[in-house]
Amino acid sequence: MPETMDISPRNNHRVTFISALLVVLFLLLFAVDRGLFNHLIDTSYVWSAQHFGWFWQIFMLANFGVAMFALTRRGAGRKLGQRSEPEFPAFQWVAMVLCTLLAGGGVFWAAAEPIAHLVSPPPVFPEAAPLSNQAIDQALAQSFLHWGFLAWSVLGSLAAIILMHLHYERGLPLAPRSLLYPLTGEGGVKGWMGDLADIVSALAVFAGTVGPIGFLGLQISYGLSEFIGTRDHLPMQLGTIACLMAVYLTSAVSGMHKGIQILSRLNIVLGLLVLAFLFLAGPTQFILEHFGGALLTHLAWLPQQALFRGDEAWLSAWTVFFWGWFIGYGPMMAIFIARISRGRSAREIILLMSVVAPLLTMAWFSIIGGTGLGLEAANPGTITAPFEGFNLPAVLLAITGALPFNTVVTLAFLVLTALFVATTGDSMTYSLSVVSSGTDHPPRWLRLFWGLTMGVTAMVLISGSAGGIGKLQSFIVVTAVPVSLLLVPSLWGVFKAIKPPSD
């Protein structure tokens, strides 16, 4: 019999109340004193990047290294979650995992980031002239760092395995507080430290989800306005976010086996169709050549890329920002992965999260971003002219506009972006509700509460000023400071979690 512990899940009204209160105070400050709001966010962002950026870089590399080592351990083949067979078939499992993270980068960043690095090459590499052939592989390789092995590994390998062990085999809550157990034992999980862990994790993923809802909602609105030839004004932006909110709320309320699963499958199918078209209609040979070259560059330079500290201003705008974003997502994403991975082994989870998903994401970036790079190489100015002034939203439309059947392709990308955002919205609504309710099956009213709160927050920030969503994305990095400390015990706790019971 597995060892159990008397820490029963409960309705954690205190965590819900404090988290919601802090969100309200955040919005009140935004509404009352915009100057003070901006100053506090900017100052906190700079402080977090300066004092924790180096730590995050080391932690991200260490987390991936420990995951690769844990993969080889004898206990890694043991089924987790108190099930002998997986709850979800392989395709559905992979679809839900991929769609939840790719919301932020699946379309927008895959198109824009490689071009940004082509125009302004990353300082970690030996000097390459902007827009040169050498800069192409380096641009993709830098994108691979930000969306590849290290990013995926922190989102659900070690932490998810620990939560599955502690929740399903030891009786601890399926909540961020349980990640404290390898360090503090029962006392830290049950006391104020546990409440604090849940609150900061809730705020981090709240900011990390509202950011993409608002930011990508603006990109969809911009794309629609260009598509139909009208002005991109506030009512269109708010209407776009309201539609996104309606989709992910419907999905989240319908449950894990219905809405979330169906939306993820639809997302994957449409994504594969779009990728196939881009690969065949775009610069196919260019994509294949530079995917291979960029992957080899990334593997050869991975330690240098991960630990580069030569340009702190560049790091805070790119690598440290992404690391803060993904670390902030870590505990809540781990809850989601733990819930959908019952009946899977630690080895399966690590392989998917730390190897397979990163490679699929790199291929995704190579096809979407590589198409833009190839179009630019063949006809200089095709992509960089619309991108001038760091106009990131214009890159995707420039790519689709240069392809055959551009009207259909543009519309498909806008729908795909909406589906990605909705998939992350429903998944994180579910995770927040799990923490708030203390049960794997949170009530519908609680899912509605968190889903509505995220959507309304995005609308308020957009209505208030052009930079509101941008400030929220900076706040993501601030919340990652305490969350990163919460994830550290996973580096050694995973070995206890995968240890066979007989040992």
Residue ranges and their predicted role:
Residues G188-L196, V200-R344, L351, V356-T410:
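Membrane-embedded translocation segments of transport machinery
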Residues R14-L21, W47-N63, V94, I136-Y168, ...:
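Extracellular loop-to-transmembrane helix junctions
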Residues P2-A135, A276, S490-P501:
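N-terminal alpha-helical transmembrane segments of multi-pass membrane transport
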